[in-house]
Amino acid sequence: MAKYFGTDGIRGEVGKSVIKAEFMQKLGNAVGTLINDNGYPGFVIIGQDTRSSGKFLKFALVSGLNAAGIDVIDLGVVPTPIVAFMTVKYKAAAGFVITASHNKFTDNGVKLFSSSGFKLDDALEEEVEAKIDSDFIYQTECKFGNYKVAENFIDEYIENLFERFGSLVNYKGKVVIDCANGAASNHFEALLDRFCIDYISVASNPDGLNINVDCGATCTSNIKKAVIEHNADLGISLDGDADRIIIVDENAQEIDGDGILNIIAQYSNICGGTTGIVGTQMTNMSYENHYKSNNIPFIRSKVGDRYVLEDLVKHGYKIGGESSGHVINLNFGTTGDGLSTAIQLLAIFSQSDKPVSAFKLPGELMQQTMINVPLNFKVTSDHLAKLAGDVAKAEERLGSRGRVLLRPSGTEPVLRVMVEADTKDLATKEAEYLVEKVKQKLV
């Protein structure tokens, strides 16, 4: 079991968890030592989101890397997918992003990409953790690393997307964007300017403390309100590091990651093509049934975009994602990318005069109820085994009308209890039953 890594990097409350300057320095040195041990190119790329804690954590990380002899190219405040993109383009040994994604501003963390632009697999994470807990290594003969700022690399990312989609995007509707006061602030606007999109920007004034506060992909009431106020045709909401995207239609109705994935799957010829789709354990059953009825291969991965990616590679598919808004298209990148996904959607919506709502899955989706149960310990398979009988009873009552999922969060100290059913009342009833059992047996 991982000591430091969760489902999406390492994160926690700054100063009250492992997210401290000392740890970041050790992490940098650990990765730098592994880079040297494996003979990779001696430089890495680094970026950060807008949190006030980002700079001191970044420089602690840089000091550990430099001590190991690794050069660092700093992109400044940039979305996570841009770091992954640049890591691959410039053949860096690794890419780091100082971010806690959609978490509150008091948290921070780090996401780590391999030289191929993928998040680390479990085995490599274990190697990194072992090095963190080993002695700090200084480069021999004082051949320490250098540090360079290169904040204009964002232009290369924008031009790459324009080369691919410039001839396809001709969207005439009014768009509202919510940058979560995060890493996409100003960058998303520059991207839309390049495509000549008529847009209004909200939550794009970061001050170091307001990232994800009442805005962004985890607080869609903000973008819904903006769509109504501005009579917009489309709303696009990103999270703090812009690897998630949620959209709303002209009626301010939300389309989550599953819905976005379904739209891209329907028009995959515009988006590079795929032979199948990867969702997760959280993907609504309605989408699974839709894919099956249209003879589109569909599989569920574990929750977490790194697991979606693993299954994409394993099965040779190109497009996958999560309900939360991580959407991966291996035709264009190696990780969840809110900016690229937004452009793909604009390319699709440009192909007809239909409103955004017309691209949604027809009919009502299966109803989901999810309740987070706070716990002060890490949930293991032994804990879940204590609830197996209760889960079986709920599943028996649901029959073919729904399903049950109990899942420990990889980023928060909670157990997520999710029930899906054909009515909201039934989903809520069974979810509350299971929450009560969790409290009786685990709390």
Swiss-Prot record:
Q: Which cofactor does it need?
A: Mg(2+)
> What's a BP term from Gene Ontology annotated to this protein?
carbohydrate metabolic process
Q: How is the cofactor bound?
A: Binds 1 Mg(2+) ion per subunit.
Q: Which GO terms describe its molecular function?
A: magnesium ion binding; phosphoglucosamine mutase activity; phosphomannomutase activity
Q: Name one GO cellular component term.
A: cytosol
UniProt catalytic activity: alpha-D-glucosamine 1-phosphate = D-glucosamine 6-phosphate
Keyword terms of this UniProt record: Isomerase, Magnesium, Metal-binding, Phosphoprotein
What Gene3D superfamilies does the annotation carry? Alpha-D-Glucose-1,6-Bisphosphate, subunit A, domain 3, Alpha-D-phosphohexomutase, C-terminal domain
Residues that coordinate or bind Mg(2+): 101, 239, 241, 243
EC assignment: the record states 5.4.2.10
Catalytic site positions = 101
Q: Does the keyword Protein biosynthesis apply?
A: no
List every position bearing Phosphoserine.
101
For this protein, the record's SUPFAM superfamilies field holds: Phosphoglucomutase, C-terminal domain, Phosphoglucomutase, first 3 domains
Q: How is it modified after translation?
A: Activated by phosphorylation.
Q: Which InterPro entries match?
A: A-D-PHexomutase_a/b/a-I, A-D-PHexomutase_a/b/a-I/II/III, A-D-PHexomutase_a/b/a-II, A-D-PHexomutase_a/b/a-III, A-D-PHexomutase_C, A-D-PHexomutase_C_sf, Alpha-D-phosphohexomutase_SF, GlmM_bact
> Has UniProt tagged this entry with the keyword Cell membrane?
no
What does it do?
A: Catalyzes the conversion of glucosamine-6-phosphate to glucosamine-1-phosphate.
Q: Which HAMAP family match?
A: GlmM_B
Q: Which PANTHER family match?
A: PHOSPHOGLUCOMUTASE (ALPHA-D-GLUCOSE-1,6-BISPHOSPHATE-DEPENDENT), PHOSPHOHEXOSE MUTASE
Membership in a protein family: Belongs to the phosphohexose mutase family.
Name the record gives this protein: Phosphoglucosamine mutase
